[in-house]
Amino acid sequence: MLFHLFYPLASNLKILNIFKYLTFRTIYAMITALIVCFVLGPWIIRKLEGLQARQVIRTDGPESHLEKQGTPTMGGLIILTAIILPTLLWADLTNVYIWLTLFIIVGYGLIGFMDDYLKVVKKNTKGLSARQKMFWQVLLAGGVAVFLYVTPGFNEMLYVPFFKNFHPDLGIFFIPFVTLVIVGASNAVNLTDGLDGLAIGPVAINAATYMLFAYVAGHATLSAYLQIPRVVGAGELAVICGAMVGAGLGFLWFNSYPAEVFMGDVGSLSLGGTLGVIAVLTKQEILLVIVGGIFVIEALSVIFQVGSYKYRGKRIFRMAPIHHHFELKGVAEPKIIVRFWIITIILALVAISTLKMR
């Protein structure tokens, strides 16, 4: 909005030329997101408390979690507001990738909102069924996949980090692959969101990493020099990534241990889906497995736990996702959280190193 309002006036007022610079708009999207969190956060938390939108704590989990009973949830509304508003203010709204990403943010946010609303406000403990959530997730992600598949100029090749000459053409299989990336990322972040600040920290780190890759992918000279796929217009996604970083840090102010609010499904499903679609649009889908390694480990721990119990009658972990396993082993919650953040930072550095290791 500000880009379209002020940049056309740059011919009369030279200082407004600054709006054409992606770095400037990305930084201010980040700052704006932080401000939105700090201004709206306390108000939204009070409203959630007034609605009795309080987290239901599992009785079969770690005993320390019983202290969290009564903490308001659905705080993802703070995050989504802090991402959407700065994006609308600072991004180039003629860019189709911006609208595809906003489509996933809002769409997956609505799925999570309905699930949270039914569970914590309407006191329907089941919320949306797993099938209902999966149906809508696949439908929205599939819609994005089909749109990209039929869009001229967007290739269906799969680019693999560390291998500059290996990029198989997925053809029609591009559609289910994209759907899997978006849905998988969404649910992996959702599974990770079990401790105070555990999910939002890695989400912010992932967003910062993709902010760099989006900028490079959209830059003709840098993408050619670093030999990563050039995606015309993808650089604008750095603005959304910047807003995600700012929103993540702003929400962490309230969500850090001991949390004043939880993000709920409205936040986790939407944030995961957003990371997935950005990975697809920047042609860095495989990179998400590296930088989002914590999310992958959390998801795999659940899959292995369920599979082992179903076919062997034995559990691999004391409890899944794996962060609960460490809790039951006696590791303090803050230590688990910070260690997972450290691992994510290391994985982000490995992911960034792929820019040169090709």
Swiss-Prot record:
Entry-linked InterPro entries: Glycosyl_transferase_4 (IPR000715), PNAcMuramoyl-5peptid_Trfase (IPR003524), PNAcMuramoyl-5peptid_Trfase_CS (IPR018480)
Required cofactor names: Mg(2+)
Pathway: Cell wall biogenesis; peptidoglycan biosynthesis
Record has Transmembrane helix as a keyword: yes
Catalyzed reaction equations: UDP-N-acetyl-alpha-D-muramoyl-L-alanyl-gamma-D-glutamyl-meso-2,6-diaminopimeloyl-D-alanyl-D-alanine + di-trans,octa-cis-undecaprenyl phosphate = di-trans,octa-cis-undecaprenyl diphospho-N-acetyl-alpha-D-muramoyl-L-alanyl-D-glutamyl-meso-2,6-diaminopimeloyl-D-alanyl-D-alanine + UMP
Transmembrane feature ranges: 26-46, 71-91, 93-113, 134-154, 170-190, 197-217, 234-254, 261-281, 286-306, 335-355
Keyword Metal-binding included in the entry's annotation: yes
Main localization (coarse): membrane
One biological process term in Gene Ontology: peptidoglycan biosynthetic process
Membrane topology: Multi-pass membrane protein
Protein's name according to its UniProt entry: Phospho-N-acetylmuramoyl-pentapeptide-transferase
Annotated source species: Trichlorobacter lovleyi (strain ATCC BAA-1151 / DSM 17278 / SZ)
Classification lineage: Bacteria, Pseudomonadati, Thermodesulfobacteriota, Desulfuromonadia, Geobacterales
